[in-house]
Regions:
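Glycine-rich phosphate/diphosphate-binding loop of Rossmann-like nucleotide-binding domains
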Residues: 1-63
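Glycine-rich phosphate/nucleotide-binding loop
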Residues: 49-146
Length: 146
């Protein structure tokens, strides 16, 4: 599954105009296992998957601890093992200008960072700016860079 995800991320980045994508990969265990101190999943599962895609020409690096990998902003994408590992930093950067894109499926789809906001539905409190931003982003990704 990690290999498929990294290939999908690489293809999606190329589709939006990044010719040579650089992809960071988070670990499964805390701090990417600290060389086996906190588990062996990153040694046994994540590192071999990264090596497989690197052998196919994909510039993937890791595994990195999910709590610190975002500090290195030289990557074009950050792939994570768990949903919240990716959403937390994105929401901290800009809650109303953040969207989740799902790649590797037959249909490209996205959701706004705040979710459905059912708690404020029909109360006149909703701010459509996140939805508008998300629609602009996904329409650009669907069309591609050209």
């Amino acid at each position: 599954r990690i290999v498929r995800t990294l290939k999908a991320a690489n293809a999606a980045l190329k589709r939006i105009g990044i010719a040579e994508p650089r992809i960071a990969v988070s670990g499964i265990d805390p701090h990417a296992g600290e060389g086996g101190l906190f588990g062996s999943d990153d040694i046994d599962i994540v590192a071999p998957a990264i090596e497989d895609v690197r052998n196919e020409g994909i510039d993937a690096s890791g595994p990195f601890g999910a709590d610190t990998m975002y500090l290195d902003q030289s990557f074009d994408a950050y792939t994570v093992m768990f949903h919240d590992q990716g959403h937390i930093p994105a929401k901290l950067i800009g809650f109303t200008g953040t969207a989740a894109f799902t790649i590797g499926t037959p249909i490209l789809f996205s959701s706004v960072a705040h979710g459905s906001a059912l708690d404020i539905a029909g109360k006149g409190k909703a701010d459509p700016s996140a939805l508008i931003w998300t629609l602009k982003q996904i329409s650009g990704a669907a069309v591609g860079p050209d």
